Structure formats: C-alpha cells, structure tokens
Amino acid sequence: MISTGLEKLDELLGDGIKNGIITDIFGASSTGKTQLVLQIAVNSLSLGGTILYQDTTGNFRPERLLDMLKPKELDAALLDKITVGRITNMQEQFSAISKIEQSNYSLVIIDNITDLFSFEYSKEEQILEKNKQFTKYMKQLASVVFEKKIPVVAVNMIRKINDIEQENLDSVMSLFTHIKIKLSKKSTNYMGEVFPHSGENRFYYKIEKNGLTSST
C-alpha cells in the first residue's frame, strides 16, 4: 500500500493505493490532480520504491517533487529513483506498456492517460476509432498491471459534452479502472470523491506548495 498523504482518502481507499489495479484520478483543471500523484510518488520513494512516470503533456517538473521532499526531510537523491518517460504520440504510449512489463517498478504514473488519444483523434468522425484504439491500449495496460501486480495511477481530465461535465473517454476508463478519485472545486473549497464506495465517499483538501493537505 502507498499512502496518498491524505488520511481520509487513505481510509476510503482501504489504507492507500493498492497493487495490481489501475487507480483513476480525474477532475477539472487546477483541482490538484498532478500534485496528488506527485505526493503519492514521494510517499512511494520514502518506502524505497522506484517509479516510472509517463508524461504525455510535458508538464512534469522535478522541482515540485523537491518542494514535497523537503518537509519530510527526504534526500533529493531519491529523485534518481524516478524514471521519466516523455511520450509525445499515441504510438509511443502503446510502446511504453512494454517498459512496465519488462521492469519491476514499485509504482507507475501516467499523466495524462487520454490526452494524446483525444489529440490524434480530434474530429467528430473519428470518435469510434478513438474509442477502439483507447480500448485496445487500456486492455493491454490492464493485462500487464494484473500480471505484474504493479500499482498504476492514471490522471485524466474532464470535458464538457452538451454542457455536461464528463470524464474524458469515461466509457472506456470505467471498464478497466478499479478505483476512481474525482477531484473538484466549489468556490474556494476542494472536494474529492471515491468510486465505487458504499456510504460516505467524500474527503476535503487544500492545495499547498508542499502538496495536498486535509481540510474539514
């Protein structure tokens, strides 16, 4: 188990991020998605873990990890245990699955998992092909995750469809992800929800320089 750094979220997840499943973190822009996965990465590093960070957006910033390491008094040399793979097209994202299969990482982060598929299949008439290719990708990824018993955390975005907010490629994501964490902001308050979950599934948080902290 890897702690998320948020006590209530860990409780809702049954102690943290589990092995052998894909955990889906999604939400609108500026709700703390990337900060949460970086926080999970730092907690994995503190346990001696090695991490594969697949960056499809070019937004990975090691200095943000340093900001999180310092309060925990962890050595900056731990960053050497993170392998960052910059992925610039859909084919590279498919090929990157083999890196997971051939290695023994303690944690894999994919940020953002759907972005390149939406970019390369951006036209209305390409929707079916986009869903077909993304389904193929997720099926291959899920198979490796199950076989290797590796925890994978995927970041995804929200899009507006007919003025309704919906997770990007939700119909496919829901087939292959086991836990969903939705992050949202209302006014100045941040809230997360965990699915599926019976009973109360919400947690509240603040975004700070050194990561996400619990809020009431």
Language-model segments: which ranges?
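P-loop NTPase motor core
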Residues: 96-172
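Phosphate-binding/switch region of NTP-binding enzymes
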Residues: 143-216
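Pre-Walker A adenine-sensing motif
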Residues: 4-16
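Short, surface-exposed amphipathic charged segments that create phosphate/polyanion-binding patches used
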Residues: 93-103, 194-199
